[in-house]
């Protein structure tokens, strides 16, 4: 998992409340047995004018020119600005996978669905909760100025606007540690690899029958 320390990126405003995970990555794409390739289908039913299917070549599909991520001014955005209750609905982990693979490092909103919020941290996407007043202001700024960028300093727990205004946000110490060090669940486990190996070796000595292979 990629480390998250300080990130500066273009902001894309998604001005919709209660965006559920089926909107983020529609159900038909969950058939895949891989963890990759979901970025092209992020917000599939909003980005495209036709119905998408797994394995389809998205480069030939008709796009919805009115959808925010299809507008040239937001091309390459790495920060998604959203409204309240973002990520509600089913608990599919494919939702943060799709956001990450599209290129979003962070999502800023007044509130998130609990499971989606947790899944973001496990997959390298930083979900940031700001007040509705602060989010309203950022929407106004993003829409008023082309190329509007924000800087996110995870160590300082601040979102910094171009004029220097800093918005503080909360993050649990353990989740912050994992993102700063690029540690997912597997990475955390591997930090204790020596202890795991030592335990397994000791267990075999005490319970040798565990190592017996049946014919």
Curated annotation (Swiss-Prot):
The UniProt keyword set, sorted, is: Amino-acid biosynthesis, Branched-chain amino acid biosynthesis, Leucine biosynthesis, Lyase
Listed CDD domains: IPMI_Swivel
- Provide the GO biological process annotations: L-leucine biosynthetic process
Extract one GO cellular component term from the record.
3-isopropylmalate dehydratase complex
Stated EC number for the protein is 4.2.1.33
Q: Which reaction does it catalyse?
A: (2R,3S)-3-isopropylmalate = (2S)-2-isopropylmalate
Does the entry feature the keyword Amino-acid biosynthesis, yes or no? yes
- Fetch the Pfam families from UniProt: Aconitase_C
Q: Which domain of life is it from?
A: Bacteria
Among the GO molecular function terms of this UniProt record, one is: 3-isopropylmalate dehydratase activity
Task: Give the enzyme class.
Answer: lyase
This protein's pathway reads:
Amino-acid biosynthesis; L-leucine biosynthesis; L-leucine from 3-methyl-2-oxobutanoate: step 2/4
* Quaternary structure note: Heterodimer of LeuC and LeuD.
Its annotated function is as follows:
Catalyzes the isomerization between 2-isopropylmalate and 3-isopropylmalate, via the formation of 2-isopropylmaleate.
The family database entries (PANTHER family) matched by this protein are listed as: 3-ISOPROPYLMALATE DEHYDRATASE SMALL SUBUNIT, 3-ISOPROPYLMALATE DEHYDRATASE SMALL SUBUNIT 2-RELATED-RELATED
Write out the similarity annotation.
Answer: Belongs to the LeuD family. LeuD type 1 subfamily.
Name the UniProt record assigns to this protein:
3-isopropylmalate dehydratase small subunit
What organism does the UniProt record list as the source?
Polynucleobacter necessarius subsp. necessarius (strain STIR1)
Q: Which gene does this sequence derive from?
A: leuD
């Amino acid at each position: 998992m990629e480390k998250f320390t300080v990130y500066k990126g273009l902001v894309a405003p998604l001005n919709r409340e209660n965006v559920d995970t089926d909107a983020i990555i529609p159900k038909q794409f969950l058939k895949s047995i891989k963890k990759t390739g979901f970025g092209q289908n992020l917000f599939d039913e909003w980005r495209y004018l036709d119905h998408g299917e797994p394995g389809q070549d998205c480069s030939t599909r008709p796009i919805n020119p009115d959808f925010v991520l299809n507008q040239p001014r937001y091309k390459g955005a790495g920060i998604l600005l959203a409204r309240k209750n973002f990520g509600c609905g089913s608990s599919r982990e494919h939702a943060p996978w799709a956001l990450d693979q599209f290129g979003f490092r962070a999502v800023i909103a007044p509130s998130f669905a609990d499971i989606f919020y947790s899944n973001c941290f496990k997959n390298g996407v930083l979900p940031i909760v700001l007040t509705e007043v602060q989010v309203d202001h950022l929407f106004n700024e993003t829409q008023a100025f082309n190329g509007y960028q924000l800087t996110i300093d995870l160590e300082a727990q601040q979102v910094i606007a171009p004029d220097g205004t800093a918005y503080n946000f909360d993050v649990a110490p353990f989740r912050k540690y994992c993102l700063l060090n690029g540690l997912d669940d597997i990475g955390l486990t591997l930090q204790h690899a020596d202890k795991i190996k030592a335990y397994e070796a000791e267990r075999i000595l005490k319970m040798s029958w565990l190592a017996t292979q049946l014919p």
